[in-house]
């Protein structure tokens, strides 16, 4: 009997050893998975540091390029100012020399005329008068010829100087174009490098996120196994209670049957004793087995309590991080409000532009009707020359007005199209996202929805299996879930606001208006240059046909002034171009910062959602035993 009892007592010990080994293996797997998760977190941190380093390098390169460009522009400005100063000094010297020459000529003429007057007063003869007249005519002709030759030489010199200035300007423009092309190529290469680094980082982040998702699935499977083991322990506890009740009933039966033992016959008493001994051995074995199972269940409960404390600490850390993110997102919310105000201002300006376009189209139609009426009157009526000239002048004036209004209408229509395009683009960017799909920087993430649905189903199944918990724990779970949902909704709303702000920045810093403005200024400068060339040709013709004119000095000064005005316009345009380039660069930098911020928010949001789902699932086995 003792050997049989030992063999039967060793079997539950072997079972307990197997269960302990399985629990130790599960614990080792969980620790290894936690270690790998920490390693992945460190890898993600290293990737962020690498992104920060790349960003710092890019900013340094941009600063270096801007410094180099500013130095080149300063050198060009100095060279241009030196050339303009030299031209100004040469023109001033020429003007002083011409003034001195004209003063000398006038003094000589005055002296000669004074001498002739003196001779006439003295009463000279007619021969003297004729001789003096011939001499005066010859001197005037010689002076006129010399002045004409001098003016022709000056015109040739001015033409040569103009050609040199045009060549220098063309050389400067070509140098600027080559430098701009080099800078564009360097900028494009830098942008390609940045995009390549971004793609590599995105690939690494996706790979890490996939690994984290796989590890989350493994953790979920292990937690399900723990839930199954907890259910088995509950069943064992129920079996233990049933066996305890059976033991109590057996003891009561033994007590009840012990009094009539003497009245039974001796054979029957021996049989009863044998049965009692066997029952005692069975009770002892059952008690030992139940004690071992109770010890195992107590150890499992301790492990689950430790796990619960760890998860509570992680939950507190996540709550702290969520509060920090809320504090960081406050300026973005304010920026969103400012962008909404700008949007309202743009809509009001669009309405004003539409009203202006309507008024201008009405005026244009009226002008066309007037022109058609005047043309019909001109066909059917014959007036004198004065009326014809007046009609032609009025027609020219009206035609110029119509052209100006047509230009204004074209500008307003272009601006209206641009604003409508921006409005459509903004409307497309403001479309609501679909349910169960999260729009991220990498695309549409549907696995997060699967993880959420899995967490909800596991939560519901565990709630059906477990015993009813206290109302305080239910309230805590409900509040935590509501907080997580609110955070997720807030993050998605802020992401959409950031997308809207980015679209507005792109529209505000677009290059169409700058290109149109440059084209207009270029056309205006070409028109001014053609006008100046026509003036120069007219002056040459006048000097050749009529001789010396009294207005050539004034026209020369006007040409010098127009040249200076053109140079000032070129300088202003260059300054505006530099300012626009700087604004474009600032807008691009701000855009990249917003993209990086959105990426960080998406990664943090996905990690918080997954950790919150995991925390809910991991809390459930603990709640089963409460």
Swiss-Prot record:
Coiled-coil residue spans: 19-255, 284-413, 490-604
Highest rank taxon of the organism: Eukaryota
A biological process from GO: protein transport
Modified residues (Phosphoserine): 382
GO CC annotations on file: cytoplasm; membrane; microtubule; ribonucleoprotein complex
Membrane topology recorded in Swiss-Prot or TrEMBL: Peripheral membrane protein
Region described as Disordered: spans on this chain: 1-22, 452-477
Modified residues (Phosphothreonine): 470
Oligomer and partners: Homodimer. Forms a complex with GABBR1 and KIF5B/kinesin-1. Interacts with JAK1 and TYK2.
Function comment: Associates with microtubules and may play a role in the microtubule-dependent transport of the GABA-B receptor. May play a role in JAK1 signaling and regulate microtubule cytoskeleton rearrangements.
Protein name as it appears in the record: Janus kinase and microtubule-interacting protein 1
């Amino acid at each position: 009997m003792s050997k049989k009892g030992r063999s039967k007592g060793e079997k539950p010990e072997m079972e307990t050893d197997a269960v302990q080994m399985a629990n130790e293996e599960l614990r080792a797997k969980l620790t290894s998975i936690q270690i790998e998760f920490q390693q992945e977190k460190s890898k993600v941190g290293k990737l962020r540091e690498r992104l920060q380093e790349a960003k710092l390098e890019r900013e340094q390169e941009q600063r270096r390029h801007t410094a180099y460009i500013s130095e080149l522009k300063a050198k060009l400005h100095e060279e241009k100012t030196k050339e303009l100063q030299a031209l100004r000094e040469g023109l001033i010297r020429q003007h002083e020399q011409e003034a001195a020459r004209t003063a000398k000529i006038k003094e000589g003429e005055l002296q000669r005329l004074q001498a002739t007057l003196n001779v006439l007063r003295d009463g000279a003869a007619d021969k003297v008068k004729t001789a003096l007249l011939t001499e005066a005519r010859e001197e005037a002709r010689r002076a006129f010829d010399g002045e004409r030759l001098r003016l022709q030489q000056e015109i040739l010199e001015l033409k040569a100087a103009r050609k040199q200035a045009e060549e220098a300007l063309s050389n400067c423009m070509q140098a600027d174009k080559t430098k701009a092309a080099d800078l564009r190529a360097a900028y494009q290469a830098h942008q390609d490098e940045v995009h390549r680094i971004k793609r590599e980082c995105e690939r690494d982040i996706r790979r890490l996120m996939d690994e984290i998702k796989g590890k989350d699935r493994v953790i979920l499977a292990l937690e399900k196994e723990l839930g199954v083991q907890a259910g088995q322990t509950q069943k064992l506890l129920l079996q233990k209670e049933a066996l305890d009740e059976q033991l109590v009933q057996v003891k009561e039966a033994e007590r009840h049957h012990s009094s009539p033992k003497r009245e039974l016959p001796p054979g029957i008493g021996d049989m009863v004793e044998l049965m009692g001994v066997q029952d005692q051995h069975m009770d002892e074995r059952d008690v030992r087995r139940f004690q071992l199972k109770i010890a195992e269940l107590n150890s499992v409960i301790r492990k689950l309590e430790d796990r619960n404390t760890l998860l509570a600490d992680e939950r507190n850390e996540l709550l702290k991080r969520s509060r920090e993110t809320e504090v960081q997102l406050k300026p973005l919310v304010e920026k969103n409000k400012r962008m909404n105000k700008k949007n309202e201002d743009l809509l009001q300006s669009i309405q004003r532009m539409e009203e202006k376009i309507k008024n201008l189209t009405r005026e244009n139609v009226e002008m066309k009707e007037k022109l058609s009426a005047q043309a019909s009157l001109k066909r059917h009526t014959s007036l004198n020359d004065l009326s014809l000239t007046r009609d032609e002048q009025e027609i020219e004036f009206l035609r110029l007005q119509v052209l100006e209004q047509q230009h204004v209408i074209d500008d307003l229509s272009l601006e209206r199209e641009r604003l409508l395009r921006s409005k459509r683009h903004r409307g497309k960017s403001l479309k609501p996202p679909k349910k169960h799909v999260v729009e991220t920087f990498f695309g549409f993430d549907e696995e997060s929805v699967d993880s959420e649905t899995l967490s909800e189903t596991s939560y519901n199944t565990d709630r059906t299996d477990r015993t009813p918990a206290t109302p305080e724990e239910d309230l805590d779970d409900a509040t935590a879930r509501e907080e997580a949902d609110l955070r997720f909704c807030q993050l998605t709303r802020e992401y959409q606001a950031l997308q809207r702000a980015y679209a507005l920045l792109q529209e505000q810093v677009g290059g169409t208006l700058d290109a149109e403005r440059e084209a207009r200024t270029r056309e205006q400068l070409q028109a001014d240059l053609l006008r100046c060339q026509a003036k120069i040709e007219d002056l040459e013709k006048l000097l050749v046909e009529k001789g010396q004119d009294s207005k050539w000095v004034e026209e020369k000064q006007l040409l010098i002034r127009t040249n200076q005005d053109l140079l000032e316009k070129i300088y202003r345009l260059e300054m505006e171009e530099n300012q626009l380039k700087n604004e474009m660069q600032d807008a691009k930098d701000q855009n990249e910062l917003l993209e990086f911020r959105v990426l960080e928010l998406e990664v943090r949001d996905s990690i918080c959602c997954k950790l919150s789902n995991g925390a809910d699932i991991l809390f459930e086995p603990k709640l089963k035993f409460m």
